[in-house]
Amino acid sequence: MAFDYKKEYKEFYLPSRKPHLITVPPMNFVTVQGKGDPNDPAGEYQAAMEVLYGLAYTIKMSYKGSHRMEGFFEYVVPPLEGLWHQQGVDGVDYAHKETFEWTSMIRLPEFVTREEFDWAVQEATAKKKQDFSTAEFRTYDEGLCVQCMHIGPYDTEPETLRQMDAFA
C-alpha cells in the first residue's frame, strides 16, 4: 500500500475547524512562485500547476524507469499547498485577484534530495518538452503555528483568518 501523507499526518492535512496550535517540522517542497489571478486560464497559476504536478509525478513514477532514488518508497502525491499575499493590502482583497502574489507547492517525500529534484527537472523537461526551470526545491520550517480548516468559498476566508488571529 502506498504511503499517504494525508492519512499518516492528519494533524497537518485534516485539521480541526477550530483554531489550534501545532508545531510543523521542516519539510521539503517543489515550489513555483508567481503573480496574478489563479482563475485566469492563460495565467501564470495554470502554468505553475503543470510544472508542479509534472515534477511531482516524475518523482513518484521514477521507480518504473532506470533511475533509482535511495530510500524510495511508493506514496500518494500530497495535496497542493499555497502561500498567498498582496502588496499594500491589509488582509486580502478578493476583488483584485490579479494582484495576488503566490507560492504554490507540493510536499516531497523525505528521500528526495536536491540532486534527485534536479534529476526530475531534467527528466521532465526532456520527456515533456516543456520548461520546468520555474520550479524550486525548498525547505520550509514553519515551527509553531495556528492552524484551522476553512470550509467554504474563498471569499469567506477572511472570517476564518479573523478567528485564527483572535486565537493567536
Range-by-range predicted roles:
Residues 1-168:
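A solvent-exposed interaction/effector surface
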